[in-house]
């Protein structure tokens, strides 16, 4: 019995490693995808609605160089977030910019990367914003 459990555990671990690098399934109409993008210096949430409308919630970069960045330090947090969102949007028809951007509050770890996504930088965000 112990040998069977060890074999099963080894198989489960191998399966986890084998599938860990697979990309997420492509967005399909009628489904909502929610992506949490963690950079180690500020996070973002990217949502693709069932109709293909996109929403970015926060785009953080706390600017503290001593904090570890993910996946690495070759780009700033906002650049990594933008790369990820653009990759997801490749599957969406006629989509080159995020439809809506929402900043929950005005702290760097929630909005510090917005300037890295404006038109003229990488052009991911819309040209106009509404502030309440």
Residue ranges and their predicted role:
Residues 1-4:
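Positively charged n-region of N-terminal signal peptides that target proteins for export
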Residues 98-109:
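Metallo-beta-lactamase
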Residues 64-67, 108-114:
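Extracytoplasmic/secreted cell-surface and envelope-processing proteins
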Residues 26-97:
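Conserved beta-strand hairpin/beta-sheet module of binuclear metal-dependent hydrolase folds
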Residues 96-99, 127:
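Conserved acidic residues
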Residues 7-16:
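Bacterial N-terminal signal peptides
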Residues 128-132:
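Short internal beta-strands
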Residues 18-20:
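Boundary at the C-terminal end of the N-terminal hydrophobic targeting segment
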């Amino acid at each position: 019995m112990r040998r069977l459990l060890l074999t099963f555990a080894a198989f489960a671990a191998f399966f986890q490693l084998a599938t860990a690098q697979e990309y997420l399934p492509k967005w399909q109409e009628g489904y909502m995808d929610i992506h949490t993008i963690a950079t180690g210096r500020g996070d973002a949430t990217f949502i693709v609605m069932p109709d293909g409308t996109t929403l970015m919630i926060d785009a953080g970069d706390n600017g503290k160089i001593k904090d570890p960045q993910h996946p690495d330090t070759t780009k700033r947090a906002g650049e990594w977030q933008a790369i990820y969102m653009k990759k997801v949007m490749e599957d969406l028809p006629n989509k080159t910019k995020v439809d809506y951007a929402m900043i929950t509050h005005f702290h760097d770890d929630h909005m510090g990367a917005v300037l890295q996504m404006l038109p003229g930088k990488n052009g991911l965000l819309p040209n106009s914003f509404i502030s309440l």
